[in-house]
């Protein structure tokens, strides 16, 4: 059955016959966190390839196959990982969404938004914690989920698909999310453009130095362990230069 659903006829059949379990969801979408499907849900059935939404992603940020599969298939998980990417190793940050998904039974954006804040903070603090500061990050993640629900109908990918934004508009939308300053927003835009198939007009210009091809300066440039090492070396050089400038 799974093989049939990934053929053109199977995809058409799925779109025509599967009814969603809630009227606010369009046809054919399953929960985020299932490899190869989009961040929606329907009443049973199989997932549709993420490429149907114009994205082709095989990320290698967490350096863990299952955690990276979640990031590749779930735009919301990728957003959460980016939020966590500060003051800890980036691999640990991008492994965070999988930890949360394992503990609450998936990373459905509605479920995260509606979770009891105290309980969600406790879950995020369980060892191994999702972050050095799990309590504050738990709140930020729930705030992010609520914005995705309120502004984008629970579809994190609508951040870059709704209204066909150009690079400048998409950067503006990203900066409006909790935890995204100018630089982090540009890095995320660079990641979307370089690895997530989000080639909106002007994305490289809006992403600044993080949109330049052939660089190894941010998360946007990490595709394997080797490039992770190059990015880490670059950041070490930046810190050393900053320290020398203060001396």
Give the positions of each predicted feature.
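Basic polycationic patches enriched in arginine
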Residues: 2, 15, 40-41, 53
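Cysteine-centered motifs
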Residues: 20, 37-38, 42
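Short, aromatic/basic-rich helix-turn unit that serves as a nucleic-acid recognition element
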Residues: 79-83
């Amino acid at each position: 059955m799974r093989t049939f659903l990934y053929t053109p006829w199977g995809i058409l059949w799925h779109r025509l016959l599967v009814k969603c379990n809630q009227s606010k969801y369009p046809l054919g979408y399953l929960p985020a966190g299932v490899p190869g499907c989009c961040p929606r849900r329907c009443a049973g059935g199989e997932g549709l390839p993420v490429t149907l939404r114009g994205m082709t992603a095989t990320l290698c940020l967490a350096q863990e196959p299952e955690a990276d599969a979640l990031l590749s298939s779930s735009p919301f998980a990728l957003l959460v990982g980016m939020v966590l990417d500060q003051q800890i190793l980036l691999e640990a940050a991008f492994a965070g969404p999988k930890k949360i998904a394992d503990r609450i039974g998936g990373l459905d954006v509605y479920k995260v938004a509606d979770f009891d804040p105290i309980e969600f903070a406790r879950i995020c603090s369980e060892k191994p914690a999702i972050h050095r500061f799990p309590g504050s990050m738990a709140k930020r993640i729930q705030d992010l989920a609520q914005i995705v629900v309120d502004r984008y109908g629970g579809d994190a990918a609508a951040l870059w698909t709704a209204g066909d934004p150009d690079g400048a508009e998409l950067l503006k939308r990203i900066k409006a999310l909790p935890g995204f300053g100018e630089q982090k927003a540009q890095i995320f835009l660079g990641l979307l453009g370089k690895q997530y198939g989000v080639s909106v007009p002007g994305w490289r210009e809006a992403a600044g130095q993080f949109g330049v091809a052939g660089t190894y300066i941010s998360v946007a440039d990490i595709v394997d362990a080797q490039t992770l090492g190059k990015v880490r070396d670059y950041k070490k050089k930046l810190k050393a230069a900053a320290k020398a400038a203060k001396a």
